[in-house]
């Protein structure tokens, strides 16, 4: 438990140290995100993941001899 506490403290120091040197919060946050991570890349990843979900098809889920209907997504939520 003490290790988790010290890891949390060190992460907080790592994040807030640039702020004490005059850095802006936005610059500090941008420094934590990889350079190749863009909103377009995130959106493309989500779209491709959604397409692969549709290809799987519906299947029955059975646990301990009780089967449930396949879960269907609500398409009206957009």
From Swiss-Prot:
Belongs to the conotoxin C superfamily. Consomatin family. This is Consomatin Nc1. The modification 4-carboxyglutamate is found at residue 61. The cysteine framework is C-C. Coiled coil: none annotated. Residues 1-22 form the signal peptide. It comes from Conus neocostatus (Cone snail). Residues 23-59, 71-78 form a propeptide.
């Amino acid at each position: 438990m003490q290790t988790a506490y010290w890891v949390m403290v060190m992460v907080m120091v790592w994040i807030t140290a640039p702020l004490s040197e005059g850095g802006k919060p936005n610059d500090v946050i941008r420094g934590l995100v990889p350079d190749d991570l863009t909103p377009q890349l995130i959106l493309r990843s989500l779209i491709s993941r959604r397409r692969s979900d549709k290809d799987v098809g519906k299947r029955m889920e059975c646990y301990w001899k009780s089967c449930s209907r396949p879960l269907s997504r609500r398409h009206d939520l957009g």
